Design a protein with these regions (language model features):
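Contiguous, well-folded functional domains in the mature portion of proteins
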Residues: 1-215
Length: 215
């Protein structure tokens, strides 16, 4: 029960929590009102970097959401040219994370990471179509248990300036394993083949729990 009310925070959040805590103390030295503002800031930092445990279905017939947020795209597209897949068709689901969503990212399937590719870029609004090609982003090419290509892309947003990758090439993943996070507003794209989508645009998703697609 305690962990549900006060989930652990991601390691990336500790330094921000310390900084906001120091700011709160300094603010309190000037006035209670400023101190209250600092306290609200500290609580928000804790909330943003929360890393709650999730109930993972652990079923290779499904893909789960890599992120908390809103489904903004369900479409058929060419694969990412950065991975040499521009001549291959994929289904794609995009999940937009606002600053109030949990920003820890998880793998949608069990499998092996074949490639990780980081691309620097701009920081336009992550909900825009061009964000998937222009923004700072990080690609994971994963082979699922049936040898399908599953691509997860972390995309930095208008506010986000740091993509955190916590995985390595050739790493074996269990469904729902943490693979990284993005700080302060962002998006996650999933490219997949041989699955049928189960979600619609506008639907809310929970990382590791919401079923995105089924074989």
């Amino acid at each position: 029960m305690f962990s549900k009310i006060f989930p652990k925070i991601h390691a990336e959040g500790y330094k921000f929590l310390v900084i906001s805590g120091i700011i709160t103390i300094v603010f309190y030295s000037f006035s209670n009102f400023l101190g209250l503002i600092g306290l609200v800031l500290t609580i928000w930092v804790y909330y943003f970097f929360r890393d709650p445990d999730r109930v993972i279905i652990d079923d290779n017939n499904y893909l789960v959401s890599p992120a908390d947020g809103e489904i903004i795209k369900v479409e058929e597209v060419d694969g990412p040219k950065e991975l040499g897949l521009e001549n291959k068709r994929f289904n794609k689901i995009s999940v937009f994370m606002n600053v109030f969503d949990c920003h820890v990212n998880r793998t949608p399937c069990a499998g092996k990471i074949e490639e990780i590719l980081y691309k620097p870029g701009t920081f336009v609004n992550a909900s825009l179509d061009k964000a998937s090609e222009d923004n700072e982003r990080n690609y994971f090419k994963i082979k699922d248990t049936d040898n399908n290509d599953i691509i997860v892309v972390q995309i930095a947003g208008l506010v986000a300036r740091r993509i955190v990758c916590e995985s390595n090439k050739d790493q074996e993943l269990k469904q729902g394993d943490r693979i990284g996070m993005i700080r302060f507003g962002s998006r996650a794209d999933v490219y997949y083949e041989n699955y049928q989508p189960l979600v619609k645009v506008g639907q809310k998703a929970i990382s590791g729990e919401t079923l995105l697609a089924k074989k």
